[in-house]
Amino acid sequence: MKKVMGIINKKDGIMGGSYGGFMTSWIISHNPNTFKSAIVERALLNWETMVGTSDIGIGFPEMYLLDDMSKNINLYRKKSPMTYASNITTPTLIIHSQEDYRCPIEQAEQLFSNLKKRGVKTAMLRFPGESHELSRSGTPVHRKQRFDHVISWHKKHLV
């Protein structure tokens, strides 16, 4: 991964939202000590608990993973970043909106609890009244707060 992404040393940060948040958590759980800072936003982190709790529909995980959870629960677990969360050592900021029904907030709470319990540097921002679209169409005050925290987190851990 380091060669492909052009990462030479641990001076870089990583962040992503939605699928990018999924990938950020996947990358930091499979490549510990690669990044100095991470920000996971509005991410799907656990396929198993997302089924039936997301507004995207109960068929989405089956369509994406190409298998029925009741027939192959191990695939759902194998493809979930939460399965590998115990490998994460990167300081991680988690940003989630309380009214996010696409990737319900319990997804973020699972990751935050795991990291906090293990002593990983972490923080979680919860934005009341905001949806999955916070970074694009949230209230101006919340969008500014989010941006300020992103800058602050990376400054704290990258500088």
Regions found by a protein language model. Give the residues of each.
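Active-site-proximal cap/loop segments of hydrolase catalytic domains
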Residues: 1-159
